[in-house]
């Protein structure tokens, strides 16, 4: 069992406090990056910048031909935090509602423990920006020359999970998180008076037909054995009750696990939308932005991690998870090299963490110790 010195846990809480109180939005995390650099300087860990604010720390090992990477993201979300939390964001309208402050504090704590160790391989500490918005900061890390010349044989990340109790970890070998693409459909027509629909194209009606028709993609075109989600969450037009608008915009998301079906479905979305719009007198403009791919936990590495962590924490503290339809840009690493994405329990009976991406989210900080022990055990038990 790995014991974390009390003074190191104090430092990890200090890191968390600073990061939580000073959240920054994706691709604009200047203060956060500066803070991480100061800590790495204090620990005498060399680093290089990657992208606008990403950082790759590096600890040389005895065998310099091998590298293992640990990754934490550090961007925040445009959400106003609930005011009764023990710590509060100092930036109105911005908060760490997805646990990225916790991820970074855990990785900094792990770096502090391992900085003085002689490891049999190089250890890379990836502090990544811009996870929350496309195209995601992982692209900047992967495209970095230093990363390419020290390509890891294994990359590991943790993510806060409010549905798991503190002290418990979850892993799903194989496909874990769905791919996700952004859909934007804009319909144009002549517009007109609501009392004279015969003299215009009713874009609201047309858009409604499109939303309903596209659901056949999930109910009739997708295999019943292949999880697929197509949801439109934004229906916008600037109009009023007695006006047929000239423009209507739909925005939604498409998610699945199979790359061939992913591409086929996007073709169907374009074809169905165009056919309905044009047959009803509208001109469609369709934009589908490729999002993150499917996150894949390489089974052999996932099983290795499960074995190590059960030894560290006990059989009942490491559970196997099912697939989920949310997305994560750690998936980009998983498409390139063996990867393991681990869920870190952050709730307790006395401290319900709230849901991710909500103003109520605030983790039980006892998870800091679990997270640091998790990463350290995976590194120190890997020859």
Give residue ranges: language-model regions.
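Acidic/His- and Gly-rich active-site-bordering loop/insert found
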Residues: 2-96, 101, 105, 109-120
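General structural feature for long, well-ordered alpha-helical segments within catalytic domains
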Residues: 8-15, 28-39, 66, 94, ...
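Divalent metal-coordination and catalytic microenvironments
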Residues: 19, 57, 70, 100, ...
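Active-site beta-loop-alpha junctions enriched in small/polar residues
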Residues: 24, 73-75, 130-132, 161, ...
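Non-cysteine beta-strand/loop elements that form the S-adenosyl-L-methionine
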Residues: 69-71, 80, 183-185, 339-347
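Histidine/acidic-residue-rich, glycine-tolerant segments that coordinate divalent metal ions
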Residues: 77-79, 84-95, 101-102, 117-245, ...
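Metal-dependent amide/peptide-bond hydrolase catalytic core
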Residues: 208-383
């Amino acid at each position: 069992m790995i014991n974390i010195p009390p003074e190191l846990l104090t430092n990890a809480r200090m890191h968390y406090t600073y990061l939580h109180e000073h959240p920054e939005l994706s691709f604009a995390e200047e203060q956060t990056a500066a803070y991480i650099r100061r800590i790495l300087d204090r620990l005498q860990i060399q680093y290089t910048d990657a992208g606008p604010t990403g950082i790759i720390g590096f600890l040389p090992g005895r065998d310099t031909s091998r590298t293992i990477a640990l990754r934490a993201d550090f961007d925040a979300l445009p959400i106003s935090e609930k005011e009764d939390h023990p710590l509060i964001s100092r930036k109105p309208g911005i908060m760490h509602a997805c646990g990225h402050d916790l991820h970074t504090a855990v990785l900094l704590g792990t770096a502090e423990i391992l900085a003085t160790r002689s490891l049999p391989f190089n250890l890379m500490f990836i502090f990544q920006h811009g996870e929350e918005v496309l195209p995601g900061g992982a692209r900047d890390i992967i495209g970095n020359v230093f990363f390419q010349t020290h390509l890891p044989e294994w990359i590991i990340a943790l993510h806060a999970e409010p549905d798991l109790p503190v002290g418990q970890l979850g892993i799903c070998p194989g496909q874990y998180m769905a791919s996700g693409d952004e859909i934007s459909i804009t319909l144009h027509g002549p517009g007109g008076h609501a009392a004279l629909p015969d003299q215009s194209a009713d874009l609201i009606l047309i858009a409604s037909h499109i939303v309903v028709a596209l659901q056949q993609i999930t109910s009739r075109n997708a295999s019943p054995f292949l999880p697929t989600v197509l949801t439109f969450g934004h229906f916008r037009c600037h109009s009023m009750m007695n006006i047929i608008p000239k423009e209507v915009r739909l925005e939604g998301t498409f998610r699945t696990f199979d790359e061939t079906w992913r591409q086929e479905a996007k073709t169907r979305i374009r074809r169905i939308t165009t056919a309905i719009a044009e047959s009803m007198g509208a001109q469609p403009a369709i934009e589908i932005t490729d999002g993150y791919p499917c996150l894949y936990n390489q089974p052999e590495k996932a099983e290795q991690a499960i074995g190590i962590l059960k030894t560290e924490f006990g059989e009942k503290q490491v559970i196997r998870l099912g697939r989920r339809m949310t997305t994560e840009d750690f998936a980009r690493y998983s498409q390139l090299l063996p990867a393991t994405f681990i869920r870190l329990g952050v709730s307790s009976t006395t401290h319900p963490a709230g849901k991710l991406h909500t103003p109520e989210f605030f983790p039980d900080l006892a998870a800091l110790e679990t997270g640091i022990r998790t990463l350290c055990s995976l590194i120190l038990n890997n020859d």
